[in-house]
């Protein structure tokens, strides 16, 4: 069987793709906007 290689670090995940990081840049805000329009339950991590 294959190993589960993805560990997942919550601090790193927040720093890369958290809400506050998204709001910093123009493109990040565009991501938030499009996810809101689509009706995503989770806008950001």
Swiss-Prot record:
GO terms for molecular function: structural constituent of ribosome. GO terms for biological process: translation. Disulfide bonds: none annotated. Keywords: Ribonucleoprotein, Ribosomal protein. Residues 10-39 have a biased composition (Basic residues). It comes from the Bacteria. InterPro entries: Ribosomal_bL34, Ribosomal_bL34_CS. Pfam families: Ribosomal_L34. GO terms for cellular component: ribonucleoprotein complex; ribosome. Residues 1-45 are annotated as: Disordered. Belongs to the bacterial ribosomal protein bL34 family. This is Large ribosomal subunit protein bL34.
């Amino acid at each position: 069987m294959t190993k589960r290689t993805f560990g997942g670090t919550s601090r790193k995940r927040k720093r890369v793709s958290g809400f506050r990081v998204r709001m910093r840049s123009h493109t990040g805000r565009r991501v938030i906007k499009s996810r809101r329009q689509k009706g995503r339950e989770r806008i950001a991590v």
